[in-house]
């Protein structure tokens, strides 16, 4: 590939961790002023490569060469790479909630004179940077008081304060709603017009096709190919083939639903905000699930989807929760997570790293976490049985790891999600609530998760799926509820459903399905 204005070149980068070679002779070239996408399945090495580039993994811990602006770079830490203008924004945002926007922007790079912070300059400069990223909030606003979309923009403003030449964004839209995602992509295109170079890691191939000039595919720690997207001739299927090493003919596995009787009814469900009890989050929601059925819940960010799920699952979120839960025709009382588990409910959280896993513990202990009583005799865990169950799930769920003694924090996102699912399946539930089950997961791992969901339904379990990706809901669900401002505003069958109808219900403008008042 001819690159007369090559800003970055990474040559033969190899990086190993105990028991695994994460990168194997990877090559990457990025042109000045382009948006370059980096794609690949979870565990392909994308984030590891960017951590090598940015100095998170210092020179000496990897093999190969980094050339930036024609110079060989041997970064000892992230500060050295930032001094040259290479700035990375990680998937997990690093803002301090208790500090203001301005303080976060200049954290570690304070606007000081003679060792004393100049607050007037801090606020003034922060306001200029916020304007550049299109954020109108006051620089004095605490980071905890702005949404995740705005927090992402603050991270970019922070990068701009460091005189960025190469901006690296790792899954920048993974936690954003559609509107915030579009705003961020437009901002990247605006930066490109100004001559800035960006590298974007994303599983959202439609977004990559929209903004990127070139994309490099990684697979199993190796660079497979670099494609030009400027012609518009590279299809998503072509990219997926490069990522997984084969044609993925269908995004969703085939399925013949076998739907049984109603297993769960949620009647007149109300939930108040725990921080503002005078504000209702969920308002008179009614829904039902049948055995063997996959039911979707669609809604924009803030619609109340997660609040609904968590309040049903043992009142684990919300205040003054009221309404009726009926399972198999009988009312059940669920006052705690333990009650929920005892009644056959399971909840896979949208935030696996914070609430779904103990990252510093091994796979075996994470899988057995909700089933210790079941695995115990006289109050003592049967270690042999625990190992057998974990090993069975490792094979059944295709968790890619050399050992169940591996720390869960070392796994890729897709494999972590399989551990969370294994944990809840082992508990033996009749009803599973899956909140964003494939967030931040590549297409290959998504297919495997979809297969697991199909298998659960085939076993007669009811599955409630919450997802921000409408194609996912349309591909998985037998029925879909739409939620808007805490109310169910519509219900559509698989045959009736399409993105347009769902969006109408999600924004309360009606559609052709069954309107719910």
Curated annotation (Swiss-Prot):
Xref: InterPro entries: AAA+_ATPase (IPR003593), ABC_carbohydrate_import_ATPase (IPR050107), ABC_transporter-like_ATP-bd (IPR003439), ABC_transporter-like_CS (IPR017871), L-arabinose_ABC_transporter (IPR053466), P-loop_NTPase (IPR027417)
Annotated GO MF terms: ABC-type L-arabinose transporter activity; ATP binding; ATP hydrolysis activity
Highest taxon listed in the record's lineage: Bacteria
Signal peptide interval: none
GO cellular component, one term: plasma membrane
Enzyme class: translocase
UniProt: ATP 2 binding residues: 309-316
Reaction catalysed by this enzyme: L-arabinose(out) + ATP + H2O = L-arabinose(in) + ADP + phosphate + H(+)
SMART domains reported in the protein's UniProt record: AAA
Positions contributing to ATP 1 binding: 40-47
EC number(s) given by UniProt: 7.5.2.12
Residue ranges constituting the ABC transporter domain according to the UniProt record: 8-245, 264-510
UniProt subcellular location: Cell membrane
Pfam families reported for this sequence: ABC_tran
Presence of the UniProt keyword Coiled coil in the record: no
Membrane topology: Peripheral membrane protein
PROSITE patterns: ABC_TRANSPORTER_1, ABC_TRANSPORTER_2
Keywords: ATP-binding, Cell membrane, Membrane, Nucleotide-binding, Repeat, Sugar transport, Translocase, Transport
Keyword Cell membrane: yes
Function of the protein: Part of the binding-protein-dependent transport system for L-arabinose. Probably responsible for energy coupling to the transport system.
Matching PANTHER family: CARBOHYDRATE TRANSPORT ATP-BINDING PROTEIN MG119-RELATED, XYLOSE IMPORT ATP-BINDING PROTEIN XYLG
Family: Belongs to the ABC transporter superfamily.
Protein name: L-arabinose transport ATP-binding protein AraG
Annotated gene: araG
């Amino acid at each position: 590939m001819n690159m007369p204005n090559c800003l970055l070149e990474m040559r033969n980068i190899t990086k190993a961790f105990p028991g695994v070679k994460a990168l194997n002779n990877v090559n990457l070239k990025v042109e000045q002023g382009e948006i370059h996408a980096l794609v690949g399945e979870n565990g392909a090495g994308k984030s590891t490569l960017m951590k090598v580039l940015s100095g998170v993994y210092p020179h000496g811990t990897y093999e190969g060469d980094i050339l930036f602006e024609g110079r060989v770079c041997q970064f000892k830490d992230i500060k050295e790479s930032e001094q040259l203008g290479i700035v990375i924004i990680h998937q997990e945002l690093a803002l301090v909630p208790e500090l203001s926007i301005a303080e976060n922007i200049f954290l570690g790079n304070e606007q000081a004179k003679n060792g004393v912070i100049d607050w007037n300059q801090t606020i003034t400069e922060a306001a200029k940077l916020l304007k550049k990223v299109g954020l109108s909030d006051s620089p004095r606003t605490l980071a905890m008081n702005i949404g995740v979309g705005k927090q992402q923009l603050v991270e970019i403003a922070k990068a701009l304060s460091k005189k960025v030449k190469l901006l690296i964004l790792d899954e920048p839209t993974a936690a954003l709603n559609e509107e915030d995602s579009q705003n961020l992509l437009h901002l990247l295109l605006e930066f490109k017009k100004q001559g800035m170079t960006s590298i974007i890691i994303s599983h959202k191939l439609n977004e990559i096709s929209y903004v990127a000039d070139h994309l490099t595919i990684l697979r199993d720690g190796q660079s497979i190919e670099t494609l030009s997207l400027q012609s518009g001739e590279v299809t998503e299927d072509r990219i997926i083939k490069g990522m997984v090493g084969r044609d993925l003919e269908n995004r969703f596995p085939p399925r013949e639903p076998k739907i049984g009787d109603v297993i769960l009814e949620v009647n007149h469900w109300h939930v108040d905000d725990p921080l503002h009890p005078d504000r209702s989050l969920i308002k008179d929601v009614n829904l039902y699930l049948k055995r063997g059925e996959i039911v979707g819940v669609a809604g924009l960010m803030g619609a109340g989807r997660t609040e609904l799920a968590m309040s049903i699952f043992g009142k684990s979120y919300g205040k003054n929760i009221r309404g009726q839960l009926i399972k198999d025709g009988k009312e059940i009382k669920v006052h705690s997570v333990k009650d929920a588990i005892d009644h056959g409910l399971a909840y896979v959280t949208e935030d696996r790293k914070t609430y779904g896993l103990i990252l510093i513990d091994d796979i075996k202990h994470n899988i057995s976490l909700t089933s210790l009583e079941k695995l115990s005799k006289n109050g003592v865990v049967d270690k042999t049985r625990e190992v057998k169950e974990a090993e069975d799930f490792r094979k059944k769920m295709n968790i890619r790891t050399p050992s169940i003694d591996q720390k869960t924090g070392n796994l890729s996102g897709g494999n972590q999600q399989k551990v969370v699912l294994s944990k809840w399946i082992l508990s033996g539930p009749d009803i599973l609530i899956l909140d964003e089950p494939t967030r931040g997961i590549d297409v290959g791992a998504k297919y495997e998760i979809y297969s697991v969901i199909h298998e659960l339904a085939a076993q007669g379990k009811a599955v409630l799926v919450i997802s921000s990706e409408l194609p996912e809901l349309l591909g998985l669900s037998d029925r879909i509820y739409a939620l808007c401002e805490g109310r169910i505003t519509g219900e559509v069958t698989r045959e009736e459903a399409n993105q347009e109808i769902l969006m109408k219900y999600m924004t309360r403008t009606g559609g052709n399905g069954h309107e719910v008042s």
